[in-house]
């Protein structure tokens, strides 16, 4: 081998080493990860770097499994909805580091114990939604659709940039709220109800209507859900158009989409935001700690519109640091509440926390089998 050949060989080896250094992590990152499913677990707590299995034993938390597995590399926006699909998959978006860099969509399969990632520009940057089988992501100018395998099925581009709110629908007709990203001629951002159909893996805009109009004020609307022909959305108040003065309230907006009837239902606490669907007609509603100065949630019945506020401030949470992360219902009288670095066992009938346990501070979701 002459000197020239040796030099070329050395250069080739160096190039291959450099390529391996940069490509191997990306290749490994795209491969599915696996974790063990425990037959003893009644529910799992999902964190950035682990999945813990638990059951309740005489109302006390008993850990039955703890698997270390890297799930989140960047960060999750806690205000963006996570989807549970087909009673099997937890699907959510994460943002890359630093904030705003290309993110990815993740699916955790709780039937076979598999975690898949899909790197994409079309992750849920500002909001997301779901129906029983599909996950919808949105930024300021689009809504995209993913199935449980993380295959992107379609992407709709809005004519005008729009900021959407998180939503939950039952079937293939999607209803969600949004406002134009830019102000109109009156320097306002009116709220709209969007109606999309989703058939043959295609998103189609069917209708866009003004959600609620009242002279001289503009209302704030947050997350929404649809049951039958009824739309429910959290509303944290309004601002006066002339002065921009904010009036903070606590209400649920109720819209009968058949009759056109619209009403506001008062809640026991101000500044509602995220919705957590529980069993039957029960919904947990998170409230902004900035305005309420409390950590807790409202339990709201969709049928009779009754509600009560569950104040968790007495359990040592810091209203400036801690936040509500998830609420799940495991039977008619029991809620699991993930807040800060604790999981709480809450009994509905007695308005009592029966037990609590510290968990990993990066825990973000409860999966109930």
Where do the PLM segments sit?
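N-terminal Sec-pathway targeting helices
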Residues: 1-19
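An edge-strand/N-cap motif at the start of beta-rich repeat modules
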Residues: 23-73
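Repeated scaffold domains used in trafficking and secretory/extracellular systems
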Residues: 28-35, 71-87, 120-132, 160-171, ...
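Residue position within the beta-strands of beta-propeller blades
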Residues: 45, 91-93, 136-137, 176-178, ...
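Structural motif
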Residues: 48-55, 98-107, 141-145, 182-196, ...
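A short beta-strand motif characteristic of beta-propeller blades
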Residues: 62-75, 111-120, 151-158, 202-215, ...
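Intrinsically disordered, low-complexity segments enriched in Gly and acidic/Ser/Thr residues
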Residues: 244-253, 257-340
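Blade-level signature of beta-propeller repeat domains, shared across WD40, Kelch, NHL, RCC1
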Residues: 338-369
